Amino acid sequence: MQYKNQNLTHFVKAAGUAAKLSPGGLKTILNFMQKTPALLSDIGNNEDASVYQISPDLALVQTLDFITPIVDSAYHFGAIAAANALSDVFAMGAEVINALNIVGFDTCNHDLNILKELLEGANDKVKECNALVVGGHTIESTELFFGLSVTGKVHPSKFIANNTSKIGDCIILTKPLGTGILSTALKAQMLNQKHLDIMLKNMIELNYKASQIALKFHPSAMSDVTGFGLLGHLKEMLNKNISFEIFESELPFLDGVKEYFNMGLIPAGAYKNLEFIKELTPDLNEEKLLLCDPQTSGGLLISISEKDSLECLKKLEDENIQAKIIAKVVNKQENDIIIS
């Protein structure tokens, strides 16, 4: 569907995943959550989705994600929000079964045609990964928000956790960074059409194909890059035995991102993410804010053996996925994340 400027971002305080609460603050209030033997996923490291075993051969994968508008077109907002929510299941190496819509609708500023187009965009993305939208729930809200509750399935022994990287692995990122910067420029009405088109293409792309390709190479860990930024999600992938060495010169950014960054068009979420990550890399400064930029529908982080990394990269590139090797897993260092 053609992009329409329906002024969705004008009526919200923060756009997309930049509206998330600070990761540091959340960590202090979620320590009451309990685990049972059937819950296979780890609740202590902000896993992308829950994995709950219901039989010897089947586990349910469940996640929920909703965001405020990051673009001004209702159809594209719905598609992006859906891609963002579905990504958590793909990051677990699982298959999506169905999804439920979650809608907070601002009836004061939007008519029901906005809602119709939004739901159509989401439905098209869910169909793209051979799944179904089976219902949902809508409330009136002072700000528009939309997302999905997604259910998937996986064999209990075959899901991919986010904190099981092995020393020597390479880390592949499957999408360029910078959607937080570009969406901030859009909200400020300073984003040009070329960069808007680039941002839309990036965020609407599902991580479905990338996940399917990665699984052929038996990755040791996977996650996706969303609201906590590249460094925040790498932090969640750490374990007691490893650190990450990031190759700064290899980091991919969407066209125009550095230009808008230098103009000071930086989302508040980037500063929150920087504070969250400083305990691991104390010498981190505001020059590295780009690495903390909150992403919406960002790429996968795939931890894969060095011997398989180049072949995996080629398979991704053959599917027009803009993947890059951006880091290596090393023995535990004084700083858990090293930028070289």
Swiss-Prot record:
InterPro entries: PurM-like_C_dom, PurM-like_C_sf, PurM-like_N, PurM-like_N_sf, SelD_I, SPS/SelD. ATP binds at residues 20, 45-47, 65, 88, 136-138. GO terms for molecular function: ATP binding; magnesium ion binding; selenide, water dikinase activity. Belongs to the selenophosphate synthase 1 family. Class I subfamily. Homodimer. Binds 1 Mg(2+) ion per monomer. It catalyses: hydrogenselenide + ATP + H2O = selenophosphate + AMP + phosphate + 2 H(+). GO terms for cellular component: cytoplasm. Synthesizes selenophosphate from selenide and ATP. The keyword Lipid metabolism does not apply. Its EC number is 2.7.9.3. One of its GO terms (biological process) is selenocysteine biosynthetic process. Mg(2+) binds at residues 48, 88, 224. Keywords: ATP-binding, Kinase, Magnesium, Metal-binding, Nucleotide-binding, Selenium, Selenocysteine, Transferase. The active site is at 17. The record marks 20 as: Important for catalytic activity. The keyword Phosphoprotein does not apply. Its cofactor is Mg(2+). This is Selenide, water dikinase.
